[in-house]
């Protein structure tokens, strides 16, 4: 299956599951392919045939954007370099959770979260340690007795009861011994943080030299500006004074070319899904106020405005207001 067909299939699956899905980010660079929202759940999704194609820089940017937009970065893919992804298993690449299409279908359509995650050494599960301790004590078993049943040390059993994760083989043994499961579902929409190796997210990249002027003006207008390296937009502006009703911004900046117009359309679609406003700053007068929901503001207009509040008002007047979840 081609990557384009895979993206189409995943998009259709998300729509069937009740997600509002953005237009595909059919431009380069792009750290994700689509954004999708269902209620309060927002996903920034990268769709790959081979998940090992996700590089460190893209993974880091997806995690940064997830933090700025209150979203879950997620990869859906078919295989690694060596094998197909297994169903009901969460993998990780550069700190980003990775699911197979079948696992994504179970999670988003059927409402069945995965139980297993891949880590160095094999496949593991979360163990409900409190339940395990209760069941062991109800049987009147000592730590040593259960350790003997499992073929592990007494100290290891104690760690399971304290919340240490277990191999899938141990989880199966526990279920056979007590005739009930002890595995806890993974919170994929929370980034599966309970099992993900903590990988520090790098700082924001420096803005392009051509964008520094725009960054300075937005900062003066009350936004914390986070430049991007591979996103479909140049920066995310976090509103430091949301009382004025602007909220966060997706921003672009360039001459108003055919490519810029396409990028502004995509930003409008992303803004609708991520519940942010979008604004594109142009080097020349675009002869219009907006492309779909993305405000167009020329750099000459920016330079002519001294009052930071007026800049916010200009963006608010020309951009589409975000809708509530």
Curated annotation (Swiss-Prot):
Q: Which residues bind DNA?
A: 143-162
Q: Where is this region: Disordered?
A: 189-211
In terms of PROSITE patterns, this protein maps to: HTH_CROC1
Query: Could you name the domain of life of the organism this protein comes from?
Result: Archaea
Q: Which SMART domains match?
A: HTH_XRE
Biased-composition ranges, Acidic residues, are 200-211
Domain (HTH cro/C1-type): residue spans on this chain: 132-186
MF terms in GO: DNA binding; DNA-binding transcription factor activity
Residue ranges spanning the membrane: these are none
List the keywords (alphabetical).
Answer: DNA-binding, Transcription, Transcription regulation
Q: Which HAMAP family does the entry link to? A: HTH_type_cro_C1
* Name assigned to this protein: Putative HTH-type transcriptional regulatory protein HQ_3058A
> Which source organism?
Haloquadratum walsbyi (strain DSM 16790 / HBSQ001)
